[in-house]
Amino acid sequence: MNKKLLFSLLLAGTAFTGHADEARLLRFPATNGSDIVFSYAGDLYKAPLNGGEAQKLTSHIGYEMFARFSPDGKSIAFTGQYDGNTEVYLIPTDGGEPQRLTYTATNSRDDLGDRMGPNNIVMTWTPDGKNIVYRNRISDGFDGKLWSISKNGGMSEVIPLPEGGFCSYSPDGKKLAYNRVMREFRNWKYYRGGMADDIWIYDPAAKKVENITNNIAQDIIPMWIGEEIYFISDRDRTMNIFVYNIRTKQTEKVTHYTDYDVKFPSSNGQIIVYEHGGYLYKLDPKTRKSEKISITLTSDNIYARKEMKRVADNLTAASLSPDGHRLVVTARGEVFDIPAEKGVTRDITRTPGANEREGEWSPNGKQIAYISDRTGETEIWLQSIEGGDPIQLTQNNDTYIRQLMWSPDSKKILYTDRKNRIVEVDIASKAKRTVMQNPEGEFYEVNYSPDSQWITYTKSGANNMSVIYVYHLTSGKEYPVTEKWYNSSSPVFSTDGKYLIFSSERDFNPIYSQTEWNHAYNRMGGVYMAMLANDTPSPLLPSDEMVSIEQQATDAVNKKTEATNNAVKIDPEGLPGRLIKLPLQAGNYDNFYSDGKKVWYASGRSTKVYDLAKQKEEIVAEGAYMDVAANHKKALFFKGNNLYICDFPCTKASLEENINLSDMVAPIDYSQEWAQIFDETWRAFRDGFYLENMHGADWNAIKEKYAVLVPHAKTRLDLNYIIGEMIAELACGHAYVNPGEIKGPERIPMGLLGAELSRDKGGFYRIDKILPGAIYSQKLRSPLTEPGIGVKEGDYITAIDGISTATVDNIYSLLAGKANVLTELSINRTASSKGARKVVIKPLDNEYPLYHYNWVQNNIKKAS
């Protein structure tokens, strides 16, 4: 029984959680001493601290997280996304309608799965229970600041620290233990660089800060209990709880886990609760002992239910049948056989737990080949167009297959893989052989010759320059087509077998900088043709009428010869010298096709054609790429998510009626799909990590460690978290998880004025500071400094779009959805609506460029 099957059985055995099953993947816990609140599947739940059945508190498409009980136990503050922005909300302890407290800038990077983490994370309450402290980022940058807002709402006040993160007040509320750097969401365990965090103590009265940990490891999330500050640290590799004594200044290790990290602990000042391996635990500081909290709950699993989905928006590849009447399309891991015009759309795989891709029709039209990982490894499968069960063509593959291609005679399939091999498979016998392997790197753009006897490809040499080769499959001999001094790419044989067409970077047209005495080379590529045989003339040679008549006679003889003998003739000696360059402007060229008379190619995101006889270039299709059917009579055009079929050859494609993709409906079983994504991610790192020793990690054991969590994933964010934890074990930077398909609320961008405001006693809002901008730059415009606006610091905003600002406790509640929208402000020199004048501005969606610009300008003043 293979590993994939074992994992599937494990998944099947835990897919349905009943009332008595213990819940797992419970996140971001907090306690009031009798209850525990946590996030599960994006919603908040509350359960007894000693364990038991959990009660659901929130239900929303957004993610509710980082709940914190108020000191009196009556309220819960949390971070939520109810109104299209990630903000601070408040609900009663037993649940109820959320009250929005904050109105802040809408960041594009504030998802739970992003390396920056969500914005406006609730950190704690002030000990008197009057205010809630949260961490805010004014933009997508690395810096966070601590802010405080009343539980009754109003305007937030900044805590006067340069930066701040997770924090905890001393019992008397006079000091604050805090972090400065935000790395809690990075997929990078065991980090020891300059951004490793420490625990600091801030004394507002003395205006002093003290570093109490000061070591190279991560020391994060302080919890102040009596004379001790608890925190988590990876100084002994696995993240555990440590404690620092304020009086003795000694640090002691409290928990001793060696498997999963302790994650996101919090405390009410008496008890600590935390995550470990997807479960919740409580720690008694008096005894230093931890106890698991067993929690059960019921959930409708709304984000993990099976469903049927239209998948046209998830299209990844498409190819024409030889006659152009049908297409094979891959989308969301399924392979579809669809009609070019009218007919039945068939999902020929229907495997929600596997990723099928790169579907290709055989040139003889009898079979469809595709790559699938249904066995736990990527293998090539065949599906007869007559129906029946799919046939597994390859067996026991040991790495990721990149791409496949049929031989023109439909007898073989060639594929490339992550071990930098070209492998050929015989369709009849299923025998496969390694054609070659390149120790310098992968092969690119492998293509067959028309007679199936040769292949061409690109590979890098020791100098990292890409060279094009041709290779004879029978003799095993390789011959260079280009020199090693120029990057060359995208080689294809012409269909008549006479030429090799490719791109090469040989145009050196330096662009000089206007501010520095430097230059750069851009748009170096050109279209080249190699005459494969010595006796093949250049298609660009001039000719007169007599020569043309003689050539026509020769061509007629050659056509008869080609009909009986389709062999491609290549004379290797002197081949790199038999190159011509088409008279085209230097640029970026690829996706070549040629019948020997014309050359089609992609340039500037459009398909173009060059007539060799007329020496003329024409645009075939604007903004579209082309793929030609095996019979060379139809072409498929890709434009955005739309597909079009046109007759071929053509010099002008008619892209009027796109192919109907709406009938592509696939069964989605999220539990199986997420298991596949987890498995493929693990294999991607196994096969592609830059060091074979995986930084010393036991990669097989790490997979087993985190695979047990996957069946408990109830949202895509759960899966992303598990994958992030797994790849973080490699202790390397820039290992990110793309969010994938996440269902969330519609974003409503906050309008910003490029100013700092405060509320007057009368209820109106005073402009305390206007951020100067640069009028000439759209990126640096400051709305209140536009010529003719006439707004000054000290002025009051008395109304926005006719609504009095005195009627709201936070002026930004009137600016929600106003980013880059014309907005009317009523401005007065006094805190009164009487005598106010009206101005129209366009609020910003991001103030960070203004803050950065002012920082730069201030530094210039200091230095000049």
Please report, for each region that a protein language model flagged, where it lies by residue.
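A flexible loop/linker signature enriched in serine peptidases of the S9 family
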Residues: 21, 39-45, 60-64, 77-89, ...
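Beta-strand-rich domains and repeat architectures in extracellular enzymes and scaffolds
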Residues: 21-47, 315-333, 583-604
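A short helix->beta-strand "capping" segment at the edge of beta-propeller domains
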Residues: 21-26, 52-54, 299-315, 568-585
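Blade-terminus and WD-like Trp-Asp/Gly-His loop motifs, strongest in beta-propeller folds
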Residues: 30-33, 67-75, 123-131, 167-175, ...
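C-terminal, low-ordered peptide segments at domain boundaries
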Residues: 294, 298-303, 651-673, 777-782, ...
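Terminal targeting/pro-maturation regions of precursor/exported proteins
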Residues: 655-730, 734-736, 759, 763-765, ...
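Extended, small/polar residue-biased N-terminal targeting/export presequences
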Residues: 711-766, 833-859
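PDZ/PDZ-like domain segments forming the peptide/carboxylate-binding groove
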Residues: 747-807
